């Protein structure tokens, strides 16, 4: 296990203090103030992909015990629906530099976009539907990298003529050369934008810490070896099951799903204790957190509302600002410390995981991916603030109200969201029903990037393999259980096909992709002839709509090298012909509402009522 310099945060601070010597307010890490004279620069190298530094899983006799990197964590990153329908501010976003001072979203202006890419990645000519653009990051003496995303064109731009000579899996900050880690360093010329922001945060943590030990401090990048062990799930059937702890008494118990709020009363200011693992819940259902200084969170985002759900790494609540706008706020759970000797290492890994998730989320801007807006810190506790969408996709599937046209619309949106993600050199690795939410306009959004990894770097053709079993059993690609390394792109493709199967049939095809399960074993066997529906792919495909079978069959190819990639999935003739809902990337308004379907949006309480009514009919 590599080491990381421990964090020594003040008791009440916001992550923007990473870039500001004065009292911390918050990190609006992505807002660029084009009207000011502020100098912006990316700072240092970052950790390479987790798939390069992760410990390989060599325990072949433990194949049947499936490990999770984030077990049961459906809502551990973003609103365990209901999420919210507050429109995002449409200011441009960039990654903050170490010289960034406080910039509010309301005062931000759009920055110019560089349209002169020298060489795109091979997979950047995909038909990507974008919701936002990431403006040009100005050059500086510390910033040889220029990152842009411009629609379906070039996700990465690298004008610097010098290729990086250091191609390490783990970033190294030398404290022997200088008192500060960023004063005399060579910067990687081929880093992913996610890693650039990650390194800025790490450098500030390094400087804020009082550690003066000479030598190098090595940082592990997003371990994917499944350290959060959970025993294999044993289900009685293939019925769809959540993989997180759902808070059944959700936000809608006290709020109408059209969000008509009572403005007449002033809510009591809650006490926030962000350094405790347990939340205090009063009789009114509000989830309260105690802290000595809750003003920052309350002033910017409002009072935390009812807890929506929780997973292995934290819990998510909805917050309502004074103007009525809603946000999803995730509080990451501080790890239990075993002993004094391991405290620093555990805290370092914890902060690394949280900031990595923030860095990935804040890099992505697309209509089918939830927006990551801000990160706040209180001591050793982190709060991640995200766009809020009101409807839980798992609930929508389980409502049994979806028409096939509605299913196809959601599937197309999901494919475009993942295609965009892959075009940015990132793989999700935990795609499932639980990690999708839906807006009031029927726009599906991907959430939870805690397991995401970089598989391709700017200006490079190499695909970086991933390691470790990450995800939930039924959605896993079979190679994860057999190989020590795998291509995370095609693992995502497999998971999307399983999601489509679940949407259509309301059940899983198998408990896990292992031949010890009869359903999967029959799927892998050679059919006796082309009409054999017991063995081979037809066992699954015959149950799906006819026009979808060709592309789903290619997505479920057992051999990873034969599996179709997302840029080809979105070009499939059937998928292209599917009418789907789209929003305007500037205004956020719905620009296309297909006439062949409408979206049946139900809340948790409405689903419970439908289930109760269905149960009464069955009993009669």
From Swiss-Prot:
For region Disordered, the annotated ranges are: 1-20, 29-130, 153-186, 210-237, 252-271
Q: Where does this protein have coiled-coil stretches? A: none
Compositional bias, Basic residues, is annotated for 254-263
**Disulfide bond entries:** none
Summarize subunit and interaction data from the UniProt record for this chain: Interacts with ribosome biogenesis factors ARC1, CKA2 and GUS1.
Biased composition, class Basic and acidic residues, residue ranges: 56-76
Description of what induces expression = By the alkylating agent methyl methanesulfonate (MMS).
Q: What class of enzyme is it?
A: transferase
Q: What is this protein called?
A: Probable serine/threonine-protein kinase RTK1
Q: Name one GO cellular component term.
A: cell periphery
Q: What is its EC number?
A: 2.7.11.1
Query: What other comment is given for this protein?
Result: Present with 861 molecules/cell in log phase SD medium.
The source organism is: Saccharomyces cerevisiae (strain ATCC 204508 / S288c)
Covalent cross-link site, Glycyl lysine isopeptide (Lys-Gly) (interchain with G-Cter in ubiquitin): 334
- The active site lies at 430 (proton acceptor)
Q: Which family does it belong to?
A: Belongs to the protein kinase superfamily. Ser/Thr protein kinase family.
